[in-house]
């Protein structure tokens, strides 16, 4: 998108205003200019949780090295959701940069971090993201995550069925209908009526 001088001025002048910060992060998502990503990086330090997480997510649309470094630091956040979004945006930025050496390095680093990561939520976001970039072996890992998190002792502690639904919807394509439907059948006994209705009406899947 071409730079809008008026919007640029408004955002640079007022982006710390508490009433508009959240809207600013959403608006800046569609801007690729350096000034926009610079503001978003600043907003990843925001004390408002929603503003911060929106900024982390929006950085994923860019390809700046500074954004890559900031996101890598945020993967150490104690906040599970901030950490999760930082991982996904980090993958997006590396793929946007499209340097083979960086992609190989990121995958090696991510594999080591993944083994040490205790957050099942993070894994349920990261694995579909990798699958979306063509790493088909990620689907096998997703199946393992589904099997593990559908155990009653785990689902009573953390119900990730909504995340599983959205991940399957994201990964669905013309070549994997059967696999997607098999996973949906696995989680069906754990779904409530709202979730079943979403799959049948919004996603047009018959389960």
Q: Where do the language-model regions lie?
A:
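Structural detector for internal amphipathic alpha-helices that build alpha-solenoid repeat scaffolds
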Residues: 1, 14, 18-34, 42, ...
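Amphipathic alpha-helical scaffolding segments comprising HEAT/armadillo-like alpha-solenoid repeats
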Residues: 1-12, 33-45, 64-76, 96-113, ...
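Eukaryotic acidic, Ser/Thr-rich intrinsically disordered low-complexity regions
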Residues: 180-207
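Short inter-helical turns and helix N-cap capping residues of alpha-solenoid HEAT/ARM repeat scaffolds
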Residues: 16-17, 47-48, 78-79, 118-119, ...
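Short linear sequence motifs
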Residues: 2, 78-80, 107, 124, ...
């Amino acid at each position: 998108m071409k730079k809008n001088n008026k919007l640029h001025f408004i955002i640079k002048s007022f982006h710390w205003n508490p009433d508009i910060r959240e809207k600013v992060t959403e608006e800046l998502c569609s801007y690729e200019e350096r000034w926009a990503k610079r503001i978003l990086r600043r907003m990843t330090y925001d004390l408002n949780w929603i503003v911060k997480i929106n900024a982390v997510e929006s950085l994923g649309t860019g390809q700046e090295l500074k954004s890559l470094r900031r996101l890598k630091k945020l993967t150490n956040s104690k906040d599970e959701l901030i950490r999760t979004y930082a991982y996904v945006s980090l993958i997006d930025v590396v793929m946007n940069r499209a340097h083979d050496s960086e992609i190989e390095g990121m995958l090696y680093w991510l594999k080591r971090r993944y083994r040490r990561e205790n957050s099942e939520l993070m894994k349920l976001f990261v694995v579909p993201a990798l699958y979306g970039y063509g790493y088909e072996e990620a689907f096998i890992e997703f199946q393992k995550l589904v099997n593990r998190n559908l155990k009653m002792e785990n689902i009573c502690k953390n119900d990730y069925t909504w995340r599983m639904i959205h991940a399957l919807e994201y990964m669905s394509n013309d070549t994997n209908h059967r696999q997607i439907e098999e996973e949906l059948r696995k989680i069906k006994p754990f779904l409530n009526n709202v979730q079943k209705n979403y799959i049948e009406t919004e996603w047009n899947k018959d389960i």
